[in-house]
Amino acid sequence: MIGDILPDILAECGLDRASPDIGENIFEMRQIRSLMNVAGRDINTRVEWSRAQGSFGVTSAAFGALPVDFQRMANAGAVIFDGNDHIPVRPCVSPELWQLLEKFPPEQPYYLLRDGRIYFTVDTGAEGALVRYVSANWVSGTDAVASNADVTIFPERLLAKGTVWRWKRQKGLPYDDLMAEFEADMESAARSDRGIQ
């Protein structure tokens, strides 16, 4: 919980608060909360955390709406048609190529992300398509810290270290060692999340 790491963050930053509450509307807490949210978004975008993975289905349609917590597509095999063959669907990133694919649909299906939707070159059929994505929600159910009871989807020590080095940088204090420690811990946590020693 955020309330568990907050006293340590404040101590590292040299801020003395009895019974700190991240939701308090005082300058120090607003500043720490802002840096914490910047650090949390950075940590969540740099690693495909197992608890940030989501999926949804699109059935009998040429397009489907993206979830509200959508951040980006999963790295490998993000879209698969669910028929007997489990056909992978390739991404299309160019609007010009998409126009060509719409006019001359290839055998290999493609998808395009645009305007909060995912579009397919062919109808997904009754079996549908499974779409895997990475959620923007790095705090349980939301994408920002608001209270001491909030819980992150990644190790909270990363959030603490990421917040502290950013605070020191903002104040013009030496932060290189803290940032290097954060980066090493981040790599270790990412490997651990993937089950790699």
Label the model's feature ranges.
Residues 1-197:
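Glycine-enriched, solvent-exposed interface loops adjoining structured elements
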